[in-house]
């Protein structure tokens, strides 16, 4: 707060937070990578120092305003004491003057009070009204100062409570992160690199990767599930999958277990299978093929012969060797 009552301009008005981290591209060796990481962390350090400097300036501004408010409170107390003294003195003077007046001076056969007493009372009234105006003026200034201080304190609490940006750089590990807590909800990002392993962590209820040109969101992670509109994967290893509708142009599968299959066209060099059944046919593991006919008749075929049985189970025709 300046001398004219204007709000102090601090560095926090020019600070942009949080710091946007760039990606490290085209890094060929460990030395180049470490230099690139160090440069990024220096940028983070600069942004962090700007934020902490802005917070320090807010603390200084609060201290200045509190001192100004204390000084005004002291002036208010001094003014109150002076006004009280003036009122008590004026009352004592009136009492003394009235004690010295005679009956003729007070009434003088007139409805008007005597000039001397009237002048004293009028002066006393003017003094009281002037002091009241001073008190109201001081109270207004004090209230304005209190509102300004409350505003700055709220601003500082929002900065300290909702955003904490930190950076740690040592011989063994470099860490950068931004954490935000609002209404009990926590979100943040964290980047850690110790020269051997690196980690990038995102904590949020919903994580979105969007297309800057089209505005589409091809990747969304929410509620423990990841959703991708389109994926071009060169190699993938899936332990368990649930696919509602899939189209595969070409697949090489070493082992597969299918409960139910609908195949329009099938071409295979070799198929190894156990027994298979249909509504009126059966193919056994031993190589027998049985086909049912009308009235319970059956046709049996294997590598040696062909047998035909009628509805009663009697052999009617046998072709081959036996």
From Swiss-Prot:
Keyword tRNA processing: no
Keyword Calcium: no
Signal peptide as annotated in the record: none
Database matches in Pfam families: Phage_Tail_Tip
Function: Putative tail tip fiber protein.
TM region positions: none
Organism domain of life: Viruses
InterPro entries xref list: GpJ_CSF
Keywords: Late protein, Viral tail fiber protein, Viral tail protein, Virion
Localization in the cell: Virion
Main location: virion
Protein name: Putative tail tip fiber protein
Any one cellular-component term (Gene Ontology): virus tail, fiber
